[in-house]
A protein has these predicted regions:
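Short, ordered, surface-exposed loop/turn motifs in non-cytosolic proteins
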Residues: 16, 24-38
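Short, acidic Ser/Thr/Gly-rich low-complexity loop/linker segments typical of extracellular
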Residues: 40-50
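Hydrophobic beta-strand segments
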Residues: 32-36, 60, 97
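Extended beta-strand-rich segments in extracellular/periplasmic secretory proteins, especially
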Residues: 202-261
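Surface-exposed, low-complexity/disordered segments
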Residues: 82-226, 274-374
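Bacterial Sec-dependent N-terminal signal peptides
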Residues: 1-19, 92
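A short, solvent-exposed loop/turn motif at the edges and junctions
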Residues: 61-72
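A short, amphipathic beta-strand motif
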Residues: 16-23, 49, 83, 95
Length: 374
């Protein structure tokens, strides 16, 4: 899976390495969120359950839906550890299943959006990573540190992106982009406007509330969450999802995590520059949005989209696998200067140097490290 890493804030900062394992199976747990209470600086585990984080004299929270949250205090003596998270028992509530009105639950979140979520204008410091594979061969891999300023964490469907969203690319940690050949590899990353849209929660809510049909498949409950699995036809939005999941917080009824799995479909289009026709069929596409607590509300924590797409182009067939990931690593109560902003409607890779080797502090898989070093 993806690897999202920490941002170095001091030249000789103490760095800790953690491995997170399932207490029952002793298997690695990917996507565990680790963040400090005061600064909210954080990171996430990779596919091997490993992470690196700059040590702070504070409580480090380790959180993953489906596991009991663990909190540990760290100081300058903390360097390396293997920690175990206990799985949470989830019990199916059959009574809730047959009476669960998902549309009503979504409407409550829409009506109370500004009470449940932190929507004040601010900069979210983020790590962004894209990884694209073409016919089982890596063709694009890079990671950026960026600042994302949002006016009020509301996606405006009819407004230009630059009006309510500003992004500054601060640095490139590493990059390797193979060739500039004119094929659909340059179109495989989620269209930038849609990428920015799905960073915000309100489009998911709008789609669900206005869905043509919603079929709740099951409802599960534990001490923290009501977990709803559903299919939906979004009708006029030209989008269907299946086996999608929402985690509702039992105390506030806010959405803590939402996963959309898109029903496969075929579309036809033209390549971005040469306008050569192509046909694409996603074999799967899924995107996931998560939130963590911040000042008695919820704040954007991470976003990930993965897709495997079959593309027919110039009488040839290509299989692409693409991943894009955002992870919030810090917060600034500032704005981004106009001269530092990029055009948010352009893909990030257009701003990235094609080849830059990262420093040893970054956690890469063996395959990724070999690709960067080529």
């Amino acid at each position: 899976l993806f690897i999202l890493l920490f941002t170095a804030t001091a030249l000789h900062a103490q760095v800790a390495e953690l491995t997170l394992l399932d207490a029952s199976t002793k298997q690695p747990i990917p996507n565990v969120e680790a963040y400090y209470t005061r600064s909210l600086n954080g990171t996430i585990t990779n596919d091997e359950g490993k992470l690196r984080i700059i040590v702070e004299n504070d409580t480090l929270t380790l959180s993953h839906i489906g596991y009991a949250t663990k909190k540990i205090f760290t100081d300058k003596t903390f360097a390396k550890a293997t920690l175990y998270l206990n799985p949470q028992e989830i019990q199916l509530d059959e009574v809730v299943l047959y009476n669960f009105d998902l549309r009503k639950k979504v409407k409550y979140v829409l009506d109370n959006y500004f009470k449940l979520y932190d929507t004040k204008a601010k900069i979210l410091e983020c790590t962004y990573k894209e990884k694209t594979i073409k016919n089982d061969k890596l063709i694009r891999l890079y990671q950026n540190q960026l600042n994302w300023w949002s006016k009020n964490y509301v996606y405006q469907f009819k407004e230009p992106l630059n009006k309510f969203t500003h992004i500054q690319l601060k640095s490139t940690d590493y990059s390797k982009i193979i060739g500039k050949e004119e094929d659909t590899s340059n179109e495989l990353p989620l269209e930038q406007k849609r990428l920015i849209m799905y960073l915000h929660l309100n489009p998911y809510l709008v789609f669900l509330y206005n869905a043509k049909t919603i079929d709740v498949k099951k409802v599960e409950k534990d001490n923290e969450y009501t977990i709803v699995t559903f299919d939906a036809d979004f009708g006029k939005f030209d989008l269907n999802v299946f086996n999608s999941v929402i985690y509702f917080d039992n105390q506030t009824n806010a959405i803590k995590k939402i996963i959309f799995n898109q029903v496969p479909y075929t579309k036809e289009g033209f390549s971005e520059k040469s306008k050569i026709p192509y046909k694409s069929t996603p074999e799967f596409a899924t995107w996931e949005l998560t939130f963590t607590s911040y000042k008695d509300k919820l704040l954007f924590s991470s976003f990930a989209v993965k897709a495997k797409v079959r593309v027919e182009f110039e009488e040839k067939t290509y299989i692409y696998f693409s991943e894009e990931n955002f992870l919030r690593t810090g917060i600034q109560n500032k704005h981004i200067k106009k001269e530092d902003r990029i055009d948010v409607e352009k893909p990030f890779f257009e701003y990235v140097t094609p080849h830059k080797q990262g420093e040893a502090k970054f956690l890469l898989t063996k395959e990724e490290q070999e690709f960067i070093n080529q």
